[in-house]
Amino acid sequence: MRLILLGAPGAGKGTQANFIKEKFGIPQISTGDMLRAAVKAGSPLGVEAKGYMDAGKLVPDALIIGLVKERLKDADCANGYLFDGFPRTIAQADAMKDAGVAIDYVLEIDVPFSEIVERMSGRRTHPASGRTYHVKFNPPKVEGKDDVTGEPLIQRDDDKEETVKKRLEVYEAQTKPLITYYGDWAQRGEENGLKAPQYRKISGLGTVDEIRERAFDALK
């Protein structure tokens, strides 16, 4: 099972990724984790990546693809792998294809933007413990107060409505085109000796368990 998980920020990809990797016994490949591990290990690619990171620059796609190919040689990837948050752009998807990185499925978790804004902007956090609430879906017993300590809850900057909307704008411009990219490739079939992935789309609305069952059904 070699899989790319697509969906907007707040669509529930992280939650479903955990279910999928447990069911299929595959690792979740995070480019952020990979970069940190390569830098820590001092590998040639890690040293090169560190130069860009220290200069505050984006690590080039070609370098990230090199790290991906290195990571996929590890023993835990023998049965497959799950990409969450990569590729983010058409250029990265093209680079993956050119490098011959095989993908069996692309699974899109579809949630309307209005729902995502409500989900994320309604979150409230107790800073000391990390306990999280939601003003609509999981409210505290006393409005604005932590259930355990009674201390005030905060809204993280990341969860503020204007921030959520900006993140969705970036997704719309950069990552959403991947939906068309992989959907079209699935219809065209094999290219340059690389088998086209199957494209699956599920609704991200409903309970966590309902969405999990949809995801598992889509990957049969």
UniProtKB/Swiss-Prot annotation:
Residues 122-159 are annotated as: LID. It catalyses: AMP + ATP = 2 ADP. The gene is adk. Disulfide bonds: none annotated. Belongs to the adenylate kinase family. PROSITE patterns: ADENYLATE_KINASE. Catalyzes the reversible transfer of the terminal phosphate group between ATP and AMP. Plays an important role in cellular energy homeostasis and in adenine nucleotide metabolism. Pathway: Purine metabolism; AMP biosynthesis via salvage pathway; AMP from ADP: step 1/1. Monomer. ATP binds at G10, A11, G12, K13, G14, T15, R123, T132, Y133, G206. It comes from the Bacteria. GO terms for biological process: AMP salvage. This is Adenylate kinase. Its EC number is 2.7.4.3. The keyword Kinase applies. Pfam families: ADK, ADK_lid. HAMAP family: Adenylate_kinase_Adk. It comes from Burkholderia ambifaria (strain ATCC BAA-244 / DSM 16087 / CCUG 44356 / LMG 19182 / AMMD). Keywords: ATP-binding, Cytoplasm, Kinase, Nucleotide biosynthesis, Nucleotide-binding, Transferase. Consists of three domains, a large central CORE domain and two small peripheral domains, NMPbind and LID, which undergo movements during catalysis. The LID domain closes over the site of phosphoryl transfer upon ATP binding. Assembling and dissambling the active center during each catalytic cycle provides an effective means to prevent ATP hydrolysis. Residues 30-59 are annotated as: NMP. It is an enzyme of class 2 (transferase). PANTHER family: NUCLEOTIDE KINASE. GO terms for cellular component: cytoplasm.
